Design a protein with these regions (language model features):
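Active-site-proximal alpha-helical segments within enzyme catalytic domains
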Residues: 141, 235-242, 281-304, 362-378
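Active-site SXXK
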Residues: 113, 131-156, 180, 239-243, ...
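N-terminal leader/targeting segments and the immediately adjacent pre-domain N-terminus
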Residues: 20-125, 153, 182, 396-408
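Active-site helix/loop module of the DD-peptidase/beta-lactamase fold
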Residues: 131, 150-188, 220, 245-282, ...
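Structured C-terminal helix/loop/strand segments within mature extracytoplasmic catalytic/sensor domains
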Residues: 23-37, 42, 353-408
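Bacterial N-terminal signal peptides
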Residues: 9-17
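Catalytic-site signature segments of enzymes, centered on catalytic residues
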Residues: 120, 126-127, 194-276, 283
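Active-site Gly/Thr loop motif
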Residues: 266-269, 317-373
Length: 408
């Protein structure tokens, strides 16, 4: 038996022997202490404060607020919940089985703008604002598309330094915006979430100095830009600085009247800000589960709300359709599974399906043809879940739901 199957079998066995109503690893995640909230120094790595911190991040870190819509988009519930099942490791499972197996804090399934299923675990509720982690990168991409349409950015083939003069002479500044969107600057950057990687180094400099200084700590390019996908969160920070330069305002203030309110958010969102006043950008956007669902609906409708086009459609297609990507960025090429667009992950398969993904299991999966959205927030054991049972079962769940309404 393969190691992954052994892990899954053990996980399922543990789930079956848990007390009725118990969530996976709830004791490790702090149930006895009421799922405590961490501090700036430990919230990202400390398992014992993970659930609390991931749903209360803005209670202890400085942030911007994106105010809710005056008239929220109605999210009607289905008259009765359909039986949603999926096949995994030669077994058939339900939504509730998925929650019993995995450290899911919240889950939504939406079809044609209608809420089919909604679940919460670990005492989380519909009022909690869940952290996006790197799903925020896709939101930054949407802002780039809007700024391009408003002619605040002349061309995606312009270099970043044309707009962010402080990055002149630095490889990030001399990279085309399009290549930054594709995580293809060619600048080496190690991101493994162990506290000692380049990502940690970058964040430490950013916390004590500023974003420009942190970016200048990476002064060399090793691969020709635009030729190779290499995931690096600091490239989204480059886009965040670019947006501040061209809009003259915070990213949150820019997006509130252009995205958050027009899409019909029912609650305020928050975005953690850094020492220099810019949003984290690459992560730390916080919203209630249903508003993440509304974002998914917007994307499933190709950026439109009714007759109003919120996100430029052609930009969104460029961002999310693997057929529009160079060969190196297509599924099974950028990574062994996903392709990569403009800060979006692209599923393999002939049809256009894409994802917003964040560490520890945060996910929004979108199928525009089926108008189908799956939202998952989580507190997975490890930051990188790609090769773990969590990711494999999550993919099986998505494929199972897609298969009930269409075909892969």
């Amino acid at each position: 038996m393969q190691p992954g199957r052994i892990l899954l079998s053990c996980a399922v066995l543990v789930a079956l022997t848990l007390p009725a109503g118990a969530a996976p690893d709830e004791d490790l995640l702090g149930k006895a202490a009421g799922y405590p909230i961490g501090k700036a120094a430990n919230w990202f790595f400390d398992e014992g404060v993970r659930v609390g911190s991931f749903s209360r991040l803005d209670s202890f870190l400085p942030h911007y607020i994106l105010r809710k819509a005056a008239a929220p988009l109605t999210l009607p519930k289905a008259a009765s919940e359909p039986k949603l099942t999926y096949r995994f490791e030669k077994q058939t499972y339900s939504l509730d089985d998925f929650l019993a197996h995995q450290r899911v804090t919240g889950l939504l399934v939406i079809k044609d703008g209608q809420l089919l299923a909604e679940r919460y675990q670990y005492d989380r509720t519909a009022a909690d604002r869940f952290v996006s982690h790197s799903m925020a990168k896709s939101i930054v991409s949407l802002a780039i598309g809007m700024a391009l349409t408003e002619n605040k950015i002349a061309s995606l083939d312009d270099t970043v330094a044309k707009y962010v003069r402080d990055l002149a002479g630095n490889p990030y500044g001399e990279t085309a915006i399009r290549n930054i969107l594709r995580m293809a600057s060619g600048v080496p950057f190690n991101e493994v979430y162990d506290g000692n990687d380049d990502s940690s180094k970058f964040n430490r400099i950013r916390l004590t100095r500023d974003s420009i200084t942190a970016l200048r700590a990476f002064p060399t390019r090793e691969v020709e830009q635009g030729t190779q996908f290499h995931y690096a969160s600091n490239q989204t920070v480059v886009l965040t600085l670019l947006l501040r330069a061209v809009t003259g305002t915070s990213l949150s203030d820019y997006l509130t009247p252009r995205l958050w309110q027009p899409m019909g958010a029912e609650a305020d969102a928050t975005w953690i800000k850094t020492r220099d006043g810019t949003e984290t950008g690459s992560g730390n956007f916080n919203a209630i589960l249903r508003d993440f669902g509304r974002l998914g609906i917007l994307l499933a409708n190709d950026g439109a709300v009714g007759d109003r086009q919120i996100v430029p459609k052609d930009y969104l297609l460029d961002a999310t359709d693997w057929h529009r990507q160079p060969d190196a960025f297509k599924p099974n090429k950028a990574t062994p599974y996903f392709g990569y667009g403009y800060q979006f992950w692209l599923f393999p398969g002939e049809k256009r399906r894409f994802a917003l993904l964040g560490v520890y299991g945060q996910s929004i999966f979108v199928d525009p043809e089926l108008k189908l959205v799956l939202v998952i927030t989580a507190a997975a054991k490890n930051a990188s879940v790609g090769k773990e049972p969590f990711a494999r079962e999550r993919d099986a769940l998505w494929r199972g739901i897609v298969g009930q309404y269409g075909s892969w």
